């Protein structure tokens, strides 16, 4: 079905998107007051904007599981690009404030998802991968804990058992 025209309209505090398809008008409305009540105070920080971090951030945004989503990465242009991609792809999903930033922006996060680390390279042993990713975890955890000490932390990086222990050990 061909898309003829689409218009965003803001009426009475809600966002409306009108699409005209074959002379029928479909309306998609989002009630901003209801959305605020459902997701009030849910701030999620994703450390690492690689494939895993970006996928998790996208899933959180399209499911409407948070009201604010922060992407932090050592490669700042990558984090900014992923945040912009998710914002642009989030037009028909529940509203979520998506942005990139740095550790101080993670203050008052309800959840921190840690996806930092490098992928296993050809010929690299699992022990070498463990050592490299443990060093990365040891550098990241003290910084994020300083700004989000009461957050729930979720480690999604390989090897997850060793890195979870390392996260607990270095965070105090």
Write out the residue ranges for each language-model feature.
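A short, basic/flexible loop-to-alpha-helix module at the beginning of a structural domain
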Residues: 33-42
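Glycine-rich Rossmann-fold phosphate-binding loop(s) that bind the pyrophosphate
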Residues: 49-50
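N-terminal Rossmann-fold NAD(P) dinucleotide-binding loop
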Residues: 53-54
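Aromatic pocket-lining residues of Rossmann-like dinucleotide-binding sites
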Residues: 60
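Conserved N-terminal Rossmann-fold NAD(P) cofactor-binding segment
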Residues: 68, 72-110, 124
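Conserved NAD(P)H cofactor-binding loop of Rossmann-fold oxidoreductase domains
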Residues: 116-118
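Rossmann-like NAD(P)(H) cofactor-binding subdomain of soluble oxidoreductases
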Residues: 125-172
């Amino acid at each position: 079905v061909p898309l003829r025209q689409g218009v965003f309209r803001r009426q009475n505090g809600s966002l409306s998107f009108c699409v005209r398809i074959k002379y029928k008008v479909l309306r998609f409305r989002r009630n901003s007051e209801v959305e605020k009540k459902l997701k009030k105070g849910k701030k999620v920080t994703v450390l690492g904007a690689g494939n895993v971090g970006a996928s998790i951030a996208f899933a959180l945004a399209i499911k409407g599981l948070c009201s604010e989503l922060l992407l932090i990465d050592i490669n700042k242009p990558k984090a900014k690009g992923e945040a912009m991609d998710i914002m642009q792809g989030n037009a028909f999903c529940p509203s979520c404030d998506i942005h990139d930033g740095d550790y101080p922006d993670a203050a008052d996060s309800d959840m921190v998802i840690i996806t930092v680390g490098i992928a296993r390279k050809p010929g690299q042993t699992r022990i070498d991968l463990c050592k490299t990713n443990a060093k990365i975890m040891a550098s990241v955890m003290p910084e994020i804990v300083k700004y989000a000490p009461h957050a729930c932390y979720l480690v999604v990086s390989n090897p997850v058992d060793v890195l979870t222990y390392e996260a607990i050990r270095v965070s105090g």
